[in-house]
């Protein structure tokens, strides 16, 4: 073997066999530190969850090497016979999980799945209705800073000021007045049950499509803890992470064959090129997990834990928007503690409790300050936390917020936060992740 060939072989051996720690210790270190953070912190961000080892293995597989533009059986590249199997499994499992006739599992994100529906069903300048961001909607539901608000004429509906529940009379009135081509139901910070049947009645009355973005509650729908929108909506979108407990990505469901064709064309070639086959493999694994009987128990526990957390926070003098929760999340009004969302998020973070500042309906504060925080129970429930643990977590949150109120400064109360941090580390240590103790 020549010296050149020997050098090439040695280089190949390193390329295929050296570990991440050997090749890139900086990235390895960041990942190791992030694992430590996740292990020792209580994650209450409602849009986050923890995937199984099986999902991690699928998403970290050699499927990342394969380009697969197109759909199973109709690829623009050769060598797709095995990724076809993966995508077909993901599609069939998604259809079974949600009782849908058609599923597209290729969207790379929640934003892209919603963009694909708009591309399929709307023209620039068309009118659609969506939940106002300040009432719990999402950027892609018509926010003026988002493509959805720039390309279309958006009519937003909201919640009532007295009880913070969806104002269905307002939805009906706005629909009759504006004759939208599409009505979008679903949100990111609404803690009550959605009346899909009523939304469909309104949509039918004005000749609109009904689109449901169930990204936050898809796992609860799959687990039987929230009514399914699939029988009512013309098209449903959902992310595959959040309460569904899969990899980060999106999915589109419909029972209408004509809409399915439009959706497929909108996703590819309209919006995306080659799908992320390693992510689709992770989706397929997560769907298989969600089809198991134990996932129904998980979904029930998510809701039970959320209700327990909300009641515990109320017992400590905090207000919960709409008075409580029927799903996995809640908005906490911090004004009784004279705190802002920005200050509370930082103080809780110092105590190893992760959440996000969030506007509340009719919030007087600026969007990057806010009067509230959003809390969710999917990740903690995945770790094994039950009602007792979430009651303890509610008490710890109140302890930090009371300390923040006494300190009356952005720096918070260091002594209180350190004491709570130690309790958090002790609690999380009883529920290890990925086989690691401590």
Swiss-Prot record:
Q: Which residues carry this modification: N6-(pyridoxal phosphate)lysine?
A: 242
Any GO CC annotation of this UniProt entry: cytosol
* Site entry: Plays an important role in substrate specificity: 241
- CDD domains, per database record: SHMT
Name its co-factor(s).
Answer: pyridoxal 5'-phosphate
Q: What is its main location?
A: cytoplasm
Cystine bridges: none
**Enzyme Commission code(s) on record:** 2.1.2.1
Its annotated function is as follows:
Catalyzes the reversible interconversion of serine and glycine with tetrahydrofolate (THF) serving as the one-carbon carrier. This reaction serves as the major source of one-carbon groups required for the biosynthesis of purines, thymidylate, methionine, and other important biomolecules. Also exhibits THF-independent aldolase activity toward beta-hydroxyamino acids, producing glycine and aldehydes, via a retro-aldol mechanism.
Q: Which NCBIfam families match?
A: PRK00011.1
Q: What is this protein called?
A: Serine hydroxymethyltransferase
Q: What is the lineage of its organism?
A: Bacteria, Pseudomonadati, Pseudomonadota, Alphaproteobacteria, Hyphomicrobiales
Q: Which gene holds the coding sequence for this protein?
A: glyA
């Amino acid at each position: 073997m020549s010296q050149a060939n020997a050098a090439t072989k040695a280089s190949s051996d390193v390329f295929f066999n050296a570990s991440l720690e050997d090749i890139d210790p900086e990235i390895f270190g960041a990942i190791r530190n992030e694992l430590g953070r996740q292990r020792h912190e209580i994650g209450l961000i409602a849009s986050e969850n923890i995937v199984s080892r099986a999902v991690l293995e699928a998403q970290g597989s050699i499927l990342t090497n394969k380009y697969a533009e197109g759909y199973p059986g109709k690829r623009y590249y050769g060598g797709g016979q095995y990724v076809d199997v993966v995508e077909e499994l993901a599609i069939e499992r998604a259809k079974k999980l949600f009782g849908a006739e058609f599923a597209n599992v290729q969207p790379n994100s929640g934003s892209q799945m919603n963009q694909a529906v708009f591309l399929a069903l709307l023209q620039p300048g068309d009118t659609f209705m969506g939940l106002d961001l300040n009432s719990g909607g999402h950027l892609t539901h018509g926010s003026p800073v988002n493509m959805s608000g720039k390309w279309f004429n958006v009519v937003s509906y909201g919640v009532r000021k007295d009880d913070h529940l969806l104002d269905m009379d307002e939805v009906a009135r706005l629909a009759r007045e504006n004759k939208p081509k599409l009505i979008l139901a679903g949100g990111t910070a609404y803690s009550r049950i959605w009346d899909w049947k009523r939304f469909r009645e309104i949509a039918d009355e004005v000749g609109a499509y009904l689109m449901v973005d169930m990204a936050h509650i898809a796992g609860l729908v799959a687990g039987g803890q929230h009514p399914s929108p699939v029988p009512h909506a013309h098209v449903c979108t959902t992310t595959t992470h959040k309460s569904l407990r899969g990899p980060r990505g999106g999915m589109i469901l419909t029972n209408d064959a004509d809409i399915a064709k439009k959706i497929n064309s909108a996703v590819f070639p309209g919006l995306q090129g080659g799908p992320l086959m390693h992510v689709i493999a992770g989706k397929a694994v997560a769907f298989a997990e969600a089809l198991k009987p134990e996932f129904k128990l998980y979904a029930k526990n998510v809701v039970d834990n959320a209700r327990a957390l909300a009641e515990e926070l109320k017992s400590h003098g905090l207000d919960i928007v709409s008075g409580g929760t029927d799903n996995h999340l809640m908005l906490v009004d911090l004004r009784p503690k004279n705190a802002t969302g920005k200050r509370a998020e930082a103080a809780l973070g110092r105590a190893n409790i992760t959440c996000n500042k969030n506007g509340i309906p009719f919030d007087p504060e600026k969007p990057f300050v806010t009067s509230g925080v959003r809390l969710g129970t999917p990740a903690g429930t995945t770790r094994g936390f039950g009602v007792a643990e979430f009651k303890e977590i509610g008490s710890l949150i109140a302890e930090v917020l009371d300390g923040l109120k006494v300190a009356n400064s952005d720096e918070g109360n260091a002594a209180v936060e350190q004491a709570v941090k130690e309790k958090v580390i002790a609690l999380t240590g009883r529920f290890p992740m990925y086989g690691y103790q401590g």
